[in-house]
Amino acid sequence: MIEQNVSVIIPSYNRAHLLWDILPSYFQDEVIEVIVINDCSQDNTSEVLKEIKKKYQKLIILENEKNRKQMFSKNRGLNIAKGEYIFFGDDDSYLQPGTIKRMLQTKSDTGADVVGARILYMNSDEQNFNECIERHNIDGRFISDLSRLEFSFTQALSEPVECFYAQPFILTEKQTIGDLRFDMRYTGNCYREETDFMLTLFLSGKKFVYDSQALLINFPPQKATGGARTANKFLY
């Protein structure tokens, strides 16, 4: 029997038109709950989430009374998560089948504290996921340079590799996170709002591993409208 011990946390803002395409991909066998935090969306996100819950009983819906941004929403999800493991997802990123199982196995095999997945971004002219994957098989890069705070995780590698950072899509034990939370002083879509969170884990001695076979596909920009992006990308 497969143990269901992973809590998925997904903030969402104005992505009602994507939720039926995206959320079902996260209900993988090892997942005990998918926590979606509706960040006071102005579209019909609330109604769509209620419809999805009729089919997927593991969906947990949290509603922010006002728009509080990604950091608050992720922290809110962390505070109620009941799984032994945490996985952070996104409301415009499709989780490939078997990814959660793969990340759990990689964590066990490598002794990693944090396992990061590969995220690929579809171009506007790409019609399906395979086109996106094939392009990155040619053009993908793997960079993990702490001295320059430079990283790229789009290359397909033959095996998991140790690194100092990961994409936002990580799997880790809840006890590894402990009392650490995303810093609420960041406003806007900073040098990625999760960068500080990741580096705090790394500098505390946690081992990061990147597994390119754990894969998410981000929908193209003309479809992935809405979301939490802001103009104040470097505001602190």
Language-model segments: residues:
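A conserved acidic beta->alpha catalytic loop
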Residues: 25, 38-48, 66, 93
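Glycine-rich, basic loop-to-helix element that forms the pyrophosphate-binding segment
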Residues: 64-81
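Conserved donor NDP-sugar-binding/catalytic core segment of glycosyltransferases
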Residues: 98-137
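Short aromatic/hydrophobic "clamp" motif used to bind/position activated sugar donors
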Residues: 86
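Active-site-adjacent helix/loop segment of glycosyltransferases
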Residues: 208-236
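A short, conserved alpha-helix in the catalytic core of glycosyltransferases
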Residues: 164-170, 175-180, 187-214
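Short, flexible, basic/aromatic active-site loop/helix in glycosyltransferases
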Residues: 135-162
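Short, well-formed alpha-helical segments that are part of the catalytic scaffolds
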Residues: 15-28
